[in-house]
C-alpha cells in the first residue's frame, strides 16, 4: 500500500511508499481519505514522507494539492530518514524550521529564512532566495538561490535551473548551462556538484 499515515509523538506523518503511476497513487489517497476524513477538523498540519524523493520530485505539487482537497496542510516534507523508533526527538529550533511558500517569486521579490525553504512555484529572473538550510523548489529556478548559509551540508533541489548564480555555504557558482530536468545541487570539495534527474 503506497499511501499510509501514522501518528508519531505530536505529529501525523503521511507516508508515500514506492509507486508506479501517479494517477493510481492519487486514487488511493482519495480512497483512504474518504474513510478517515471525519477524524480531521480542517486545521491539521501534517508531515509528508516520500520514498525516492529525487525521482518523484515533479509529482509533489499534485500530491500536495490532492491532500489539500481534504483541508489538510503539509507543514514540512521529510527529505531524510525519519526515525520513528527514536526514544526522543530533539526539539527543532526556530532557526532550523522548514517554511513552505505556495507562490511564484516575481522579479524584485526576495524571501529569506534561517532554516529550510520549500517553494511550490517558480523563481523568476530578478528574484532571490536566501536560506540557512536546504532549498527545494517545485517549479523552475531562474533567479538567484543561496542555500546553506548556516549549514554547509544543505542542498538545492529544483525542477529546472536557468539562473545566473547559485550558492551553497560560501561556495558560489555561475551557471553556463541550462538544466531542463529536475536537478540536485550539493557541495563537494569546495565545488557545487549538479546531478540531473532524468
From Swiss-Prot:
InterPro entries for this protein:
CAP/MinC_C, MinC, MinC_C_sf, Septum_form_inhib_MinC_C
Q: What are the alphabetically sorted keywords of the record?
A: Cell cycle, Cell division, Septation
Listed SUPFAM superfamilies: Cell-division inhibitor MinC, C-terminal domain, Cell-division inhibitor MinC, N-terminal domain
Q: Does the keyword Calcium apply?
A: no
Work out whether the entry's keyword set contains Zinc-finger: no
Q: Which GO terms describe its biological process?
A: cell morphogenesis; division septum assembly; regulation of cell septum assembly
Looking up Gene3D superfamilies in the UniProt record yields:
2.160.20.70, Cell-division inhibitor MinC, N-terminal domain
**What PANTHER family does the annotation carry?**
SEPTUM SITE-DETERMINING PROTEIN MINC (PTHR34108:SF1)
Q: Which family does it belong to?
A: Belongs to the MinC family.
Q: How does it assemble?
A: Interacts with MinD and FtsZ.
The role this protein plays is: Cell division inhibitor that blocks the formation of polar Z ring septums. Rapidly oscillates between the poles of the cell to destabilize FtsZ filaments that have formed before they mature into polar Z rings. Prevents FtsZ polymerization.
Provide the protein name.
Answer: Probable septum site-determining protein MinC
Q: Which organism is it from?
A: Thermosipho melanesiensis (strain DSM 12029 / CIP 104789 / BI429)
Provide the organism lineage as a comma list. Answer: Bacteria, Thermotogati, Thermotogota, Thermotogae, Thermotogales
Q: Which gene encodes it?
A: minC
Amino acid at each position: 500500500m503506497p499511501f499510509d499515515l501514522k501518528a508519531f509523538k505530536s505529529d501525523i506523518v503521511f507516508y508515500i511508499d514506492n509507486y508506479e503511476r501517479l494517477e493510481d497513487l492519487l486514487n488511493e489517497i482519495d480512497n483512504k481519505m474518504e474513510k478517515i476524513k471525519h477524524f480531521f477538523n480542517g486545521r491539521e498540519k501534517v508531515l509528508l514522507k516520500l520514498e525516492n524523493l529525487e525521482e518523484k520530485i515533479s509529482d509533489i505539487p499534485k500530491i500536495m494539492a490532492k491532500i489539500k482537497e481534504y483541508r489538510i496542510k503539509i507543514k514540512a516534507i521529510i527529505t531524510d530518514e525519519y526515525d520513528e523508533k527514536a526514544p526522543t526527538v530533539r526539539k527543532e529550533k526556530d532557526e532550523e524550521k522548514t517554511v513552505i511558500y505556495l507562490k511564484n517569486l516575481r522579479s524584485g521579490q526576495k524571501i529569506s529564512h534561517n532554516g529550510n525553504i520549500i517553494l511550490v512555484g517558480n523563481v523568476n529572473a530578478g528574484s532571490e532566495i536566501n536560506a540557512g538550510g536546504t532549498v527545494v523548489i517545485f517549479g523552475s529556478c531562474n533567479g538567484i538561490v543561496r542555500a546553506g548559509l548556516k549549514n554547509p551540508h544543505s542542498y538545492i533541489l529544483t525542477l529546472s535551473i536557468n539562473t545566473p548564480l547559485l550558492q551553497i555555504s560560501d561556495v558560489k557558482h555561475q551557471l553556463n548551462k541550462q538544466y531542463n530536468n529536475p536537478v540536485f545541487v550539493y557541495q563537494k570539495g569546495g565545488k557545487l556538484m549538479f546531478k540531473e534527474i532524468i
